[in-house]
């Protein structure tokens, strides 16, 4: 049986996955599907469960239909005689023109799913598999962009020894070298606020490293920026070249903006040894804060340059760290698929673009 298309353009929305950001991905996908014009698009939700299997069906438009088991048909991606589609176990095929990638984190945002679709010839939104994989590795992103002259913090990478466990104190001292404490430690390949720890000395590095290495084999170490203000901005391509969104300044009283605070609630923090976090739905933001013209120009220019070097696809968000007393701006990292695609940044841009209009533009 073939599920026939109608006058609407069939679009698949792919989400879920096996990362710690699985539930955030569901929220993003539901918001994407709610925002797209049903007169122009026929939406096919495709949910990737924790086992890596694909499920589709109209019930997946409802948030309460994912637990304990998703409601729908199981299938696999294929290029059929009628183009790309999801071939289901009951022999039905849901055809679509392209896939909107609504994943967050590993096994979805890191290039593996993109490579799967590329191999099948299926069009999709966002970074290519190569740049997705590069962007997921925070250390490799820095090395890749180093030749551009973009200013970044000095860093070191702490790796799990081949035999397991954690590096010895001597190895830690050698690897950290001249990096000055306090340091921020974070997994190289997880979301921007998962497993992040603030450490004041080598003993604290040794204390938190086992829990971070349980999440990732590589840990990025960087000096903590003093007098810190964070700025984020998104970039996308148009027919006239790249354009930038509004700038946001996340507001927090914590030393670290962790996963729970960034995506689920507004939390607090304390100085000293900060345990790794468990991870923007309710985050307080200042949109288009009053900035010195030269600082705003730097943020927009650096984000655009990084976007160009990373393939000029999607609407990635670029995150910056700013020392407000020294006046030093540092590129921090790129988020290829921001939560709900950072629609609030585009709605407040100098040329406003509402979420329902942003999605077709991708």
For each feature predicted by the language model, list its residue ranges.
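A short glycine-rich, hydrophobically flanked beta-strand micro-motif that places a catalytic Asp/Glu
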Residues: 44-46, 219-223, 231-232, 311-325
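ATP-dependent carboxylate activation and anion-phosphoryl transfer catalytic cores
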Residues: 2-9, 15-18, 280, 284-362
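Active-site nucleotide/adenylate-binding loops and adjacent lid/helix of ATP-dependent enzymes
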Residues: 2-15, 19-20, 27, 93, ...
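Short acidic-glycine loop/turn motifs at beta-strand connectors
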Residues: 49-51, 237-240, 323-326
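Residue-level detector of anion-binding/catalytic polar loops
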Residues: 42, 123, 151, 218, ...
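Phosphate-binding site of ATP-dependent enzymes
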Residues: 197-278, 294, 298, 329
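ATP-binding N-terminal substructure of ATP-dependent carboxylate-amine bond-forming enzymes
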Residues: 1-130, 134-136, 140, 147, ...
């Amino acid at each position: 049986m073939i599920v026939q298309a109608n006058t609407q353009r069939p679009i698949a929305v792919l989400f879920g996955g096996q990362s710690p950001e699985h539930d955030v991905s569901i929220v993003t996908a539901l918001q994407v599907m709610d925002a797209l014009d049903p007169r122009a698009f026929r939406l096919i939700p495709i949910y990737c469960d924790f086992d890596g299997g694909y499920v589709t069906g109209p019930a997946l438009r409802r948030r309460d239909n994912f637990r304990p088991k998703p409601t729908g048909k199981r299938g696999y991606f294929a290029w059929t005689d009628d183009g790309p589609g999801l071939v289901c176990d009951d022999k039905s095929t849901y055809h679509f023109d392209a896939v909107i990638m609504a994943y967050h984190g590993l096994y979805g945002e890191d290039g593996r799913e993109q490579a799967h679709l590329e191999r099948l010839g299926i069009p999709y939104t966002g970074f290519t598999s190569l740049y997705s994989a590069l962007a997921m590795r925070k250390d490799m992103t820095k090395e890749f962009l180093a030749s551009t002259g973009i200013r970044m913090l000095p860093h070191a990478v702490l790796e799990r020894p081949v035999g397991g466990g954690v590096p010895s104190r001597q190895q830690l001292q050698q690897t950290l070298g001249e990096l000055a404490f306090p340091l921020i430690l974070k997994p190289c390949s997880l979301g921007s606020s998962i497993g992040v720890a603030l450490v004041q000395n080598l003993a604290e590095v040794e204390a938190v490293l086992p829990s971070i290495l349980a999440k990732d084999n590589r840990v990025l170490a960087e000096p903590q920026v003093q007098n810190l203000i964070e700025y984020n901005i998104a970039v996308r391509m148009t027919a006239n070249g790249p354009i930038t969104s509004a700038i946001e300044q996340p507001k927090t009283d914590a030393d670290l903006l962790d996963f729970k605070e960034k995506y689920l609630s507004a939390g607090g923090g304390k100085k000293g040894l900060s345990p790794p976090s468990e991870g923007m739905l309710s985050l307080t933001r200042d949109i288009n804060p009053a900035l010195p013209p030269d600082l705003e120009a730097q943020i927009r220019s650096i984000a655009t340059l990084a976007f160009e070097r990373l393939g000029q696809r999607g609407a990635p968000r670029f995150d910056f760290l700013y020392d407000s007393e020294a006046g030093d701006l540092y590129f921090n990292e790129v988020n290829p698929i921001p939560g709900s695609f950072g629609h609030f940044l585009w709605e407040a841009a100098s040329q406003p673009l509402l979420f329902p209009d942003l999605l077709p533009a991708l």
